Amino acid sequence: MNIRPLQDRVLVRRAEEETKSAGGIILTGSAQEKPSQGEVVAVGNGKKLDNGSTQPMDVKVGDKVLFGKYSGSEVKVNDETLLMMREDDIMGIIG
């Protein structure tokens, strides 16, 4: 299955979860926090404005992004869990 986001939506692959804490303690599944950064894998065409024009997207495929802890909705694509979110949910592009 292939997904193309519509309008200002972005499909993000979450970064790998940390299995060790900063102090070196191995974390179990329930203790691990889901990362709030990832890589953009697909973007929509942009947000439709009231005047009918389309505002271009600031993010592009391949960008590493930072987003809120509860941003987006999980979607399953080819046995992989990805996040679908609006561009407004993205706080910044990493580096």
Swiss-Prot record:
InterPro entries: Chaperonin_GroES (IPR020818), Chaperonin_GroES_sf (IPR037124), Chaprnonin_Cpn10_CS (IPR018369), GroES-like_sf (IPR011032). PROSITE patterns: CHAPERONINS_CPN10. One of its GO terms (cellular component) is cytoplasm. One of its GO terms (biological process) is chaperone cofactor-dependent protein refolding. It comes from the Bacteria. Keywords: Chaperone, Cytoplasm. It holds the Pfam family Cpn10. The keyword Chaperone applies. GO terms for molecular function: ATP binding; metal ion binding; protein folding chaperone; protein-folding chaperone binding; unfolded protein binding. The keyword Cytoplasm applies. It is found in: Cytoplasm. Its main location: cytoplasm. Belongs to the GroES chaperonin family. Together with the chaperonin GroEL, plays an essential role in assisting protein folding. The GroEL-GroES system forms a nano-cage that allows encapsulation of the non-native substrate proteins and provides a physical environment optimized to promote and accelerate protein folding. GroES binds to the apical surface of the GroEL ring, thereby capping the opening of the GroEL channel. Heptamer of 7 subunits arranged in a ring. Interacts with the chaperonin GroEL. This is Co-chaperonin GroES. It comes from Francisella philomiragia subsp. philomiragia (strain ATCC 25017 / CCUG 19701 / FSC 153 / O#319-036).
